[in-house]
Design a protein with these regions (language model features):
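Conserved acidic residues
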Residues: 45, 74, 124-125
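Bacterial Sec-dependent N-terminal signal peptides
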Residues: 1-22
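Redox-cofactor binding/interface segments in oxidoreductases and associated redox assembly factors
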Residues: 78, 128-129
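Glycine-rich oxoanion-binding loops at beta->alpha junctions
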Residues: 89, 93-123, 135
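Short internal beta-strands
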Residues: 72-81
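A cross-family phosphate/adenosyl-ligand binding-site feature
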Residues: 23, 81-83, 92-94
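Glycine/threonine-rich flexible loop motifs
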Residues: 132-141
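N-terminal phosphate-binding or glycine-rich loops at protein starts, especially the Walker A/P-loop
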Residues: 24-71
Length: 141
């Protein structure tokens, strides 16, 4: 009887592992892409992100939205470390232009820790893409 129970338990565990491997988790940017960015169409889009904002191929959300023909990405907002992760911990992030896209990058970790009305004046919708597992505190969450 003990042997039969052990075999049953092994079969159940193996079956669960096979099933778990078939499930694919999608990031928010992948869902938006699958929907052809329909909810962003016709809007001026601002993106709050950092280097964790990527799809399953590690492509930056900045680049994905910038390259999408029906998305009007007009500004980026960078928390600590900046939108591309090129600022050291604790250093102030300054407003600048993104070298890759030419878009304005507004700092959320410089003289202000939140977007000002001036930073938001040309934005219809904000997309927030910062991935985290939620077990630590950060200045940008």
């Amino acid at each position: 009887m003990k042997k039969i129970m052990t075999i049953c338990l092994i079969c159940i565990l193996c079956g669960s592992m096979v099933q778990a491997q078939k499930i694919r988790i999608k990031t928010g940017i992948e869902v938006l892409k699958e929907q052809n960015f329909k909810c962003l169409e016709g809007k001026r889009v601002g993106l709050i992100t950092n280097p964790t904002g990527v799809d399953n191929h590690m492509k930056s959300t900045i680049d994905i939205l910038h390259e999408a023909p029906n998305v009007n990405l007009v500004a980026l907002y960078g928390p600590e470390h900046g939108v591309r992760g090129d600022v050291h911990a604790g250093d102030h992030v300054t407003d600048m232009k993104d070298a890759s896209t030419g878009l304005p990058v507004y700092s959320l970790y410089g003289s202000t820790r939140k977007a000002t009305p001036e930073m938001l004046k040309d934005i219809d919708v904000l997309v927030y893409d910062i991935q985290d597992i939620g077990c630590r505190s950060f200045t940008y969450i």
